[in-house]
Amino acid sequence: MASSSVPPMITEEEARFEAEVSAVESWWRTDRFRLTRRPYSARDVVSLRGTLHHSYASDQMAKKLWRTLKSHQSAGTASRTFGALDPVQVTMMAKHLDTIYVSGWQCSSTHTATNEPGPDLADYPYNTVPNKVEHLFFAQLYHDRKQHEARVSMTREQRAKTPYVDYLRPIIADGDTGFGGATATVKLCKLFVERGAAGVHIEDQSSVTKKCGHMAGKVLVAVSEHINRLVAARLQFDVMGVETVLVARTDAVAATLIQSNVDLRDHQFILGATNPDFKRRSLAAVLSAAMAAGKTGAVLQAIEDDWLSRAGLMTFSDAVINGINRQNLPEYEKQRRLNEWAAATEYSKCVSNEQGREIAERLGAGEIFWDWDIARTREGFYRFRGSVEAAVVRGRAFAPHADLIWMETSSPDLVECGKFAQGMKASHPEIMLAYNLSPSFNWDAAGMTDEEMRDFIPRIAKMGFCWQFITLGGFHADALVTDTFAREFAKQGMLAYVERIQREERNNGVDTLAHQKWSGANYYDRYLKTVQGGISSTAAMGKGVTEEQFKEESRTGTRGLDRGGITVNAKSRL
């Protein structure tokens, strides 16, 4: 007769599983996740893990990032940063800024996985930005090791005089739209964790038509679809056991299209045609007929423009308001109905189109013509009226699933910032906000004085925007320095280099002046000497290295050899 007892291996396996589930539940009860909502259980997470547990350096950086941002939030200040292009920039930034940003735009234009540059359409391989994160994170780790070796080789007096640089500044990376469905987002987030990202942001545009936040033609996905992306990202972080900071971005302020009308929270912002003459003349059908007749290019565009100009596009709410105003009623009764409509459909209530029609019927405006389907684009997208209100609705929906909310804007508008912050804080008072100090804005045309520009960051920080960043700061800084130096080098030769680069490095204490030392030649000399018993005749920084010229001493110059040597000073802060 077969034994009914359970083999010890099975009970041990079950015990390990239950213990891990309990550990995850305890982890989720910590203050770090007090505001986080998950539609899945700890059992789901543990079921997706393997038996070999990993630890990730990025998790330490994520915890550091969380502490940094919460500290700024409490103080009413902001972590300010910009997009870093390379190890030089990331090490220079570390001396002055407490976070690092990795921009998808910069990667798209300067460093894709295929080396094929282009605009920010998120059409590069999905490992492009994770690769850049690893590039910068490895540089951070290396310069941290290099500094550590240098400091432990100093006397206490020397260390006291040598500023310590925290090279391990947390990196927040651009996750674009998640690069596809839920499984694509999961795999992307796994890469980010493995490559060193402390935080990741994901936006609510369609992954098929993704654009830079400051381009036209942006298409949103439904609120529910973007929530699925955020949940997929959080699930992957949970499976890996990390506290990666998740930033949810919305492009709802400037978006003009949306993929579908499936989510009722989007209904109030979708546009429909109100011209009853167009009842059986959808835009898509009109354009298809024109194309079948051989119309192309500018002619086809003119047909579309004419249709749109005569269709009477507006939201359902505006159509109802117009309908009430056309009613043959005393003015006081019209106003009463308008007030009732406004109160019943206040934007934060997210009234669906079906609910709105019921209210309109009650107010005598149920017979209005309004059709959101006939106005759809040839691609099938619905027309969308972007606004701060739309961004608030989306931000509120995303907040339980994200750590920060970022509203992409088209200009640096303090009123707009205040409106968004107030809308978010009304329902999520502890949520952290992010702001793109975009170089796509013409800041000089924004109507601000120099003083107002200087105070812009601290002013919106007090509103709750505790992480602020210039997405393409590294790109523009690199372009400016290279262009101006190249121009002057072409005219003045080495004088341009000495005046614009070498002397400025010296005057500002930039450690790349001694680039051999910056690159770690001393550090690897330590390796060589350690391997060879303390001495090495092939040490890179040994006798004969030209970097000795940069020590604080006078030396004989080489200018005017026909007139004899000229003494020049070559001082540096080594």
From Swiss-Prot:
Chief location bin: other
PROSITE patterns: ISOCITRATE_LYASE (PS00161)
EC number in record: 4.1.3.1
GO biological process: glyoxylate cycle; tricarboxylic acid cycle
Keywords tagged on the record: Glyoxylate bypass, Glyoxysome, Lyase, Magnesium, Metal-binding, Peroxisome, Tricarboxylic acid cycle
Cofactor(s) of this protein: Mg(2+)
Record's catalysed reaction(s): D-threo-isocitrate = glyoxylate + succinate
Main EC class the enzyme belongs to: lyase
Binding site for Mg(2+): D174
Molecular-function annotations in GO: isocitrate lyase activity; metal ion binding
Role of this protein: Involved in storage lipid mobilization during the growth of higher plant seedling.
Matching NCBIfam families: isocit_lyase
Family classification: Belongs to the isocitrate lyase/PEP mutase superfamily. Isocitrate lyase family.
Name recorded for this polypeptide: Isocitrate lyase
Taxonomic source organism: Dendrobium crumenatum
